[in-house]
Design a protein with these regions (language model features):
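Active-site palm subdomain of RNA-directed nucleic acid polymerases
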Residues: 1, 83-134
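Basic, alpha-helical interaction scaffolds
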Residues: 198-235
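Catalytic palm subdomain of template-directed nucleic-acid polymerases
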Residues: 12-32, 69-72, 114-156, 174-185, ...
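Reverse-transcriptase-like RNA-dependent polymerase core
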Residues: 1, 43-67
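Short, conserved micro-motifs composed of acidic
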Residues: 48, 52, 56, 161-213
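Conserved pre-motif C helix in the palm subdomain of viral-like polymerases
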Residues: 13-17, 22-28, 66-106, 151, ...
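Catalytic-core region of right-hand nucleic acid polymerases
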Residues: 1-6, 13-49
């Protein structure tokens, strides 16, 4: 590719356990779920009581919550949790895309332009960015940083947070060398890291990596340059 491009892998921290119920209700309503059904679902979540079972037997006293101090989780293992999070994450992606973020791809056959903002698999999200002809490296990296900020704010507004330990950034900025397009070394970029706002108000950073660097994703280590790295076998 002869233009700048980047992929930001942002992992959501405890995604099912962090969704605010008000946002969950809005997400389900946007998919046509009746308000009465939503009230039943969420009230069950909020007031459930649990009996712990261990090797010593079942606890005599349950623990749980009340209407005054409700739980706010979607509950890991609940059959409704994946569908509810689908509703919420769809709103999140649509909101993010409405802000203008995403990479544009041109079909060489139909000449149709496709804009792809992100690809999401439950709590693992890859965000895509592409530059424009004539765009400076500084402007492109600023655009990526703004996209990260907007996504982080979107996540926080739903009750969630981005987990830094499982997130990373990959950037490719082209340069011409004897008529060949090659990627600049990361050390020659104007910045070498991006910042990610956190739910508690802190600002954390992630290093910028090249697409040839293999990173763990969905339990597999792979690079983003199309090569077949040995990292996963060694790992």
């Amino acid at each position: 590719m002869h233009i700048q491009h980047a992929t930001i892998s942002a992992d959501l921290e405890n995604c099912y356990d962090s969704v605010a119920h008000a946002v969950a209700a809005l997400g389900m309503r946007s998919f046509g779920v009746r308000a009465t059904a939503i009230a039943v679902f969420l009230s069950c979540y909020q007031t459930m009581r649990f009996y712990l079972k261990t090797a010593y037997g079942v606890a005599k006293e349950p623990y749980g919550s009340t209407a005054e101090t409700p739980f706010s989780s979607l509950l890991q293992g609940s059959g409704l949790a994946p569908w509810t999070f689908l509703c919420v994450s769809t709103l999140m992606i649509n909101s993010y895309k409405e802000q203008g973020h995403g990479a544009e791809y041109l079909s060489p056959i139909t000449l149709q332009t496709i804009k792809l903002a992100a690809a999401m698999f439950v709590d693992d999200t890859d965000h895509f960015f592409s530059g424009e002809r004539g765009m400076t490296d500084e402007d492109f990296l600023d655009m990526v940083q703004q996209g990260i900020n907007d996504w982080a704010k979107t996540v926080i507004s739903t009750g969630g947070n981005i987990k830094i330990a499982k997130s990373h950034a990959k950037v490719s900025v082209p340069k011409w060398d004897r008529g060949q397009s090659r990627s600049k070394s990361i050390k020659h970029l104007p910045v070498r890291s991006f910042t990610i706002p956190q739910r508690d108000g802190a600002i954390k950073s992630v290093k910028i990596l090249s697409y040839s660097t293999a990173m763990k994703s969905l339990g597999v280590k792979f690079a983003g340059d199309g090569e077949n790295p040995k990292d996963h076998i060694l790992w």
